[in-house]
Amino acid sequence: MKKNIFYSFIVAILLSSCQGMDLMPADKMSDGDYWLTENDFKIYANGLYPSLMKFNGDDNLAQYDQKADLSTSYFGFNSVSNGRWLPSESDGVWDDCYAYLRKIHILLEHVDALHTTDPKILRYKGEALFFRAYQYFKLLNRFGDVPLVTHSLDIDSPELFMERTPRKEVEDAILQDLYDASLLLPKKSEMAVAVTVRITRGAAVAFRA
């Protein structure tokens, strides 16, 4: 009997002490601590830019010219036409694009959740819209019809198994994103010299053209 009382006492102490435990790791930030300032959105948006900067990779902007008939032997771009491309091969474009799209949608959702009219924050929504258009542009060029996802997905989201969206609908979404981005992005002349490497209104307008 005494043992039962003793064990019950120990369990009660352990349970009461658990109530004060921190479930969030002390070295991690929660959404409640982030997405509050212009700099928070800027730092997150910085993570979208590597998709434009790879030279010898699938995210290289120059590839769309290199895949023309003047450059068919460069980087093995003619591997399909000469029969060297195997059905089992994948260069990761599909996975990479949708991974970036999830990052983009997280940014868009947090901007919208603020209900802000601050142009300094809304410019990063413009950048995210530009990058969403760019990712779908890459998917469209490679695959044609692709699933058009417009929000972040979880592991149990039904959209993970959605059918491909017709090419025309994806094209319209790209053009709309670029138009909306052009309304939020600053002109290059409005930017400080130190930040002129970021996406501008002119870039969105030129891409849309």
What are the language-model segments listed below?
Residues L140-S152:
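Short, well-structured active-site flanking segments
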Residues E38, K42, P50-K54, F75-F143, ...:
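Conserved, well-structured interaction surfaces
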Residues C18-A62:
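Membrane-proximal, proline-rich intrinsically disordered regions
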Residues M1-D27:
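Bacterial Sec-dependent N-terminal signal peptides
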Residues V149, A194-V205:
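Aromatic-lined, polymer-binding surfaces characteristic
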Residues R208:
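Active-site neighborhood of glycoside hydrolase catalytic domains
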Residues D59-G76, P147, T196-R198:
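Short, solvent-exposed turn/loop segments enriched in Gly/Ser/Thr/Pro and often Arg
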Residues D27-S30, G83-W85, H151-P158:
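Short linear capping/connector segments at secondary-structure termini
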